[in-house]
Amino acid sequence: MRLATWNVNSVRTRVDRILAFLERENVDALAMQETKCRPEQFPLEAFAAAGYEVAVHGLNQWNGVAIASRVGLADVATSFPGQPAWAAKEGAEAVVEARALGATVGGSAGAGSSTDRVMPPKAGAAGAAGSAAGPGPAATSEPVRLWSLYVPNGRELTHPHYEYKLAWLEALRHCVINWLAADPDRALALAGDWNVAPRDEDVWDMSVFEGATHVSAPERAALAALARAGLTEVTRERVTNYTYWDYQRLRFPRNEGMRIDFVYGSAALAARVTGAAIDRDERKGK
């Protein structure tokens, strides 16, 4: 099975590029972040024509996550237990944002759940999936519990959004502990945009990030805690590169990037990984 993750930054804007990428890379399931649309606005028909069923979670034009699969899609969850809520402004009602989506792909995943967030594939259609950083478990016959995650940005170290980010990661850690305690042999993949650079070499110049989010000690400790909870980042030893380059200030041509997109896997998932890649070519487009 070929898994992948991609912060698509508007699925409606880039649907043609996404579908072309899926076909070219021949990947089975794609975790998408920043889809930036509600379920009824998602281009489901285009994915279905390519042979993918899609689970979608989006509340408005912000955030949004989705999973496209050609190997089955079942047990869809639009949040993880204990996922913190966020109030966009003072006095506003706090809501659980569209930042996490889980589904079982591969094996006997089946035809998905009975929800408008899932569209079954058309019979006989072919397809694939892929993106920024993804492992390749060897056997398509065994299911994987895949989560598409878009971790809060944090904004500034003194901003409430930063504390929200840390609380979000801590709640996720508790879920991982519980999931693996209930099923130690579960093939679990947490893929997405983590908005954290765990190591100094994951940014082009640490001096630029002095006193900023994404590289702070508490954020890095939060990701390290996932390892202690039983997860391994499965792409690190197989590929070295950045996964994100700001569109401003010619960051991409200068290779002034960050590595913030990762796939954290359980022991069962990590044992099946045979390779990984980061597709810089997709960043060359708009």
Predicted regions and their residues:
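Short, acidic/polar
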Residues: 12-23
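Metal-dependent phosphoester-hydrolase catalytic domains
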Residues: 41, 48, 76-79, 119, ...
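Residue-level detector of structured alpha->beta connecting loops
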Residues: 26, 51, 72, 184, ...
